[in-house]
């Protein structure tokens, strides 16, 4: 076990991770050495055997860093947050079977709410989206309604899902409104970990920004979860994509024909669509050219989804594809290649 040893004796670091007499920070440093120098198969086995120790080390250090961020909030503390989130990601990736059974369900959910808080910087919120999708990919049908509501609120600009409690937004899911008639005991309010800094670059279109992130992460993270049964990777993607279609596609493509199918296409000529109405929204500061936009909502989101789908259809194969005269330099669809 642990055949790679470019950084000292990894076995000694393994022992120090499990040594309860050592402080949490020391154990964290040695846990990072183990993660960075162990073979992937050995690392999976190590996490499976010592999951309780590993989560304790992670959580204790996360709490310390969170307190430090709220007191100081300097660049060094933000770098420490990045480092501890690296450990959090490894926990999500290497322990999907336990997470699927709701291991540390409330603790992980609380941490993700702190990352997804709308008062955080965009970088932290986007990282929260990425880690939340990893968690949901592992939970699959064992998630609760709250996680599905949160998934439906990850991309700002869409209508809030309705429930028996009224509209659900990311803000009231992270910090539910108080009902003092039920109980006088209330949970502590969740506050931002890293508010936006003065030099942070903003985004004019948050809907497009988070939509692109979500579509990217539900694909590229599929194989990052180390399931013992590899079929769960595809199930995880199917779970996320089915809920994307449920919560977002009806708004992005409100007039989509549900009768259409790749296998049984409708070949009738469709009715002419009305001409879109464009309005000038602003002028370019450098060229003074007018910038127009259609009044139709989610038009940018529609373009993003179409481009995302096309990226899987038009995949460049520079060396393996056949030579077709007149198509030099063109990217061919897979069915032509």
Swiss-Prot record:
- An annotated GO BP: activation of GTPase activity
MF annotations from Gene Ontology: GTPase activator activity
Which UniProt keywords are listed? Cytoplasm, GTPase activation, Nucleus
- Per the record, what is one GO cellular component? nucleus
Cited InterPro entries:
Tuberin/Ral-act_asu
Subcellular locations according to the entry: Cytoplasm; Nucleus
Q: What is its main location?
A: cytoplasm
Q: Does the keyword Transmembrane apply?
A: no
Q: Name the source's superkingdom.
A: Eukaryota
Q: What does this protein do?
A: Catalytic subunit of the heterodimeric RalGAP1 complex which acts as a GTPase activator for the Ras-like small GTPases RALA and RALB.
Q: How does it assemble?
A: Component of the heterodimeric RalGAP1 complex with RALGAPB. Heterodimerization is required for activity. Interacts with the HLH region of TCF3/isoform E12.
| Protein name according to UniProt | Ral GTPase-activating protein subunit alpha-1
Which organism is this protein's natural source? Sus scrofa
Q: What taxonomic classification does the UniProt entry list for its organism?
A: Eukaryota, Metazoa, Chordata, Craniata, Vertebrata
- From the UniProt record, report the name of the gene that encodes this protein: RALGAPA1
């Amino acid at each position: 076990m642990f055949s790679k040893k470019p950084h000292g004796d990894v076995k000694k670091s393994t022992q120090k991770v499990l040594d309860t007499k050592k402080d949490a920070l020391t154990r964290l440093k040695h846990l990072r050495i183990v993660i960075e120098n162990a073979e992937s198969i050995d690392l999976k086995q190590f996490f499976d055997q010592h999951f309780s120790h590993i989560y304790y080390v992670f959580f204790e250090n996360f709490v310390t860093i969170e307190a430090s961020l709220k007191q100081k909030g300097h660049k060094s503390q933000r770098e420490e947050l990045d480092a501890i989130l690296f450990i959090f990601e490894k926990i999500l990736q290497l322990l999907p079977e336990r997470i699927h059974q709701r291991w540390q369900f409330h603790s992980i959910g609380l941490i993700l709410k702190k990352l997804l808080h709308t008062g955080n910087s965009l970088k932290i919120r986007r990282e929260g989206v990425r880690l939340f999708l990893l968690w949901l990919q592992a939970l699959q049908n064992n998630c609760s309604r709250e996680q599905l509501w949160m998934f439906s609120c990850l991309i700002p600009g869409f209508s809030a899902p309705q429930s028996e409690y009224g509209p659900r937004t990311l803000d009231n899911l992270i910090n539910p409104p108080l009902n003092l008639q039920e109980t006088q005991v209330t949970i502590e309010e969740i506050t931002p970990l890293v508010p936006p800094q003065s030099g942070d670059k903003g985004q004019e279109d948050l809907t497009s920004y988070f939509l692109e992130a979500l579509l990217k992460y539900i694909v590229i993270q599929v194989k990052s979860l180390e399931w013992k049964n590899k079929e769960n990777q595809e199930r995880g993607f199917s779970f996320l994509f089915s809920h994307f279609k449920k919560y977002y596609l009806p708004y992005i493509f409100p007039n989509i024909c549900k009768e259409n199918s790749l296998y049984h296409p409708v070949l009738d000529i469709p009715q002419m669509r009305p001409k879109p109405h464009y309005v000038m929204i602003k002028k370019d500061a450098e060229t003074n050219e007018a910038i127009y936009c259609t009044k139709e909502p989610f038009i940018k989101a529609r373009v993003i989804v179409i481009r995302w789908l096309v990226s899987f259809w038009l995949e460049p194969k520079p060396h393996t594809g056949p030579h077709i005269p007149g198509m030099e330099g063109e990217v061919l669809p897979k069915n032509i290649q």
